[in-house]
């Protein structure tokens, strides 16, 4: 079993991911979605957490061997980023969604040197907007952002477009395609449910029709 399938299995087992194609969730954006993900839950399960953190380390070493600093997005990327930095004996920083409105007004907490090669950690990619904003903020502070590594992606076309336009490399440990395949194999969803989940990936507006 691939790392992506192993992680997908764990996400389903610990209920970090819920699939309800016949009774969809409503996202904050208003989109009706057959999937809901809360990867913060992974922190409460040592086996799952260890699988994910080791996967992050292996992936970063394979794709970004020149990395000099790990950064986590606030708040979901902070605990994972801190653990990864510890495992790799690298500096760690985190990036706020916006600068503080008091004190020094920092958006990046921690010390990042000019030109330092950075990998940003995120837990979930939907459209990628928030982590790309974080990458832009880090670049403005002088960091050399090598890329983003995340636990999971919905594989939405908008995310691919956004990362391409930003010129930022994205790698994820698991993805929507792997997860729904595992879900069908393990009996979490029916054939009809799988069909709806596949339609959602292609068209987030009209998938129920």
UniProtKB/Swiss-Prot annotation:
Question: What reactions does this protein catalyze?
Answer: orotidine 5'-phosphate + diphosphate = orotate + 5-phospho-alpha-D-ribose 1-diphosphate
Q: Where does 5-phospho-alpha-D-ribose 1-diphosphate bind?
A: 96, 100, 102, 122-130
Q: Which PROSITE patterns match?
A: PUR_PYR_PR_TRANSFER
Q: What keywords sit in the KW lines?
A: Glycosyltransferase, Magnesium, Pyrimidine biosynthesis, Transferase
Cofactor(s) this protein cannot do without: Mg(2+)
Q: Which residues bind orotate?
A: 126
What's the domain of life for this entry? Bacteria
**Keyword Glycosyltransferase annotated:** yes
Pathway the protein acts in = Pyrimidine metabolism; UMP biosynthesis via de novo pathway; UMP from orotate: step 1/2
One biological process GO term for this chain? 'de novo' UMP biosynthetic process
Q: Which GO terms describe its molecular function?
A: magnesium ion binding; orotate phosphoribosyltransferase activity
User: Record's InterPro entries?
Assistant: OPRT, Or_phspho_trans_dom, PRibTrfase_dom, PRTase-like
Q: Which SUPFAM superfamilies match?
A: PRTase-like
Its subunit composition reads: Homodimer.
The UniProt function text for this chain reads: Catalyzes the transfer of a ribosyl phosphate group from 5-phosphoribose 1-diphosphate to orotate, leading to the formation of orotidine monophosphate (OMP).
PANTHER family in alphabetical order: OROTATE PHOSPHORIBOSYLTRANSFERASE (PTHR19278), URIDINE 5'-MONOPHOSPHATE SYNTHASE (PTHR19278:SF9)
Put simply, this protein is called Orotate phosphoribosyltransferase
Instruction: Report the gene name.
Output: pyrE
């Amino acid at each position: 079993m691939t790392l992506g399938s192993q992680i997908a299995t764990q996400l389903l087992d610990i209920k970090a991911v819920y699939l309800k194609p016949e009774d969809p969730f409503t996202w904050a954006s208003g989109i009706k979605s057959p999937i809901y993900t809360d990867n913060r839950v992974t922190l409460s399960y040592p086996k799952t957490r260890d699988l994910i953190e080791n996967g992050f380390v292996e992936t970063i070493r394979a794709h970004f061997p020149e990395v000099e600093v790990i950064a986590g997005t606030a708040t979901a990327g902070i605990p994972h980023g801190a653990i990864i930095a510890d495992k790799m004996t690298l500096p760690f920083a985190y990036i706020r969604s916006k600068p503080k409105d008091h004190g020094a007004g920092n958006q990046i907490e921690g010390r990042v040197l000019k030109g330092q090669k950075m990998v940003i950690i995120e837990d979930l990619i939907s459209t990628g907007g928030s982590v790309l904003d974080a990458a832009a903020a880090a670049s403005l502070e002088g960091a050399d952002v090598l890329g983003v590594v995340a636990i999971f992606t919905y594989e939405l076309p908008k995310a691919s477009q956004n990362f391409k336009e930003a010129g930022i490399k994205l790698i994820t440990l698991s993805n929507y395609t792997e997860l729904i395949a595992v879900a069908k194999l393990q009996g979490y969803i029916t054939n009809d449910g799988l069909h709806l989940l596949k339609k959602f990936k292609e068209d987030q507006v009209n998938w129920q029709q």
